[in-house]
Amino acid sequence: VSEQPRRGRKPAKPYRRPKKDPVRILAFDALRAVDERDAYANLVLPPLLRKAREKGDFDARDAALATELVYGTLRRQGTYDAVIAACVDRPLREVDPPVLDVLSLGAHQLLGTRIPSHAAVSATVELARVVLGDGRAKFVNAVLRKVAQDDLDGWIEKVAPPYDEDPEDHLAVVHSHPRWVVSALWDSLGGGRAGIEELLAADNERPRVTLVARPGRATTEELLREEAAEPGRWSPYAVRLAEGGEPGAVEAVREGRAGVQDEGSQLVALALANAPLEGPDARWLDGCAGPGGKAALLGALAAERGAALLASEKQPHRAGLVAKALAGNPGPYQVIAADGTRPPWRPGSFDRVLVDVPCTGLGALRRRPEARWRRRPEDLDNFAPLQRALLRTALDSVRVGGVVGYATCSPHLAETRAVVADVLKQYPDAELIDARPLLPGVDQLGEGPDIQLWPHLHGTDAMYLALIRKTAD
């Protein structure tokens, strides 16, 4: 005879094991790697997806959802933090990071996707049971039910300060950027509210993959045979893959004849290659060559003119990536591991020199959304001496009549015009040349003579380029 429950007490519900959702577990694992190891999602996610596909757990739709959950959560982290903070009874710093990652994943499903609210809450609570345990899953459930009470616009009205009272803080919450980044980008861009809002919104868009057909090795016609591929907007060597396109599936990419390269990066190389020279044009230098994208394009362009490229990179493992990118280059080239501030070559050895210097990366936030939360204003002070030293080396390395290209993937004025202006004070034998005519057809390049590209205007990363000619000894 079965034992009867005591009178007046409801029978306990049988314990139900949590349902394991491989998509959300993978997304959580990726976010934990980004948080714990300072990893980048674009490096962490592909191997996780590949492993899941090999196990048979994933199809293409699963991979697309996992990718959206990871990148969407990282891009809107600032907004979601403000919403979650309004729904908990403690400061966010007192919420365990794994719990906050689960809450952020849930907030993105509720506020940033079309997943129905009940499904988003239920799936995220099940995830919490798997990765956090039943106790903390109850906390997740309570918080997400509060988040689900309004949509994104409604929450922004509640948690963002009015624009008229604090424009930068308002934009920081609405567009999910640290306040100091909003301020810096606004200073660089100039103009009123519309422009900065468009730029910040573009940072939160998922960019399509752009390929470069390396001259003499691949053609855009070949790359355009990929399904739904389109010509690039500006570069004659650029092809954009379809949404969700996998570059590893493209034969020319696998063979190294083409590569993944943002169109802004291609334009930097093209502008330097197109700059008029006085005298010979036989020796080119990429002084900060890792990981090799610009070096591979420069090497191919140099080969078309019978010029040789020296690609120098300080870190040996990155120099190895440069060598891999240049393998098969149709013209002469050499890759070395060397300190660009103490180079082994003689002064005046080169006709064209590119230095794409280490920087904060604030121009590539749409590709690396987590970078906006890692960078600090003091990073500018850390980069400044190196940026100036590398530009000085470049100017010492170019011959009279030759051209130096100073490039960054940051539009911050402290990393762009301030560096160039400071260094040129020490070089009366060097002058800025107008880079804008060297990119025919590319509009909205500013007042010159330097170039600043923008995601919302050009569909590229926010690359900066100044071209400098050595005029006399």
Name what the model sees in each region.
Residues 1-473:
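S-adenosylmethionine
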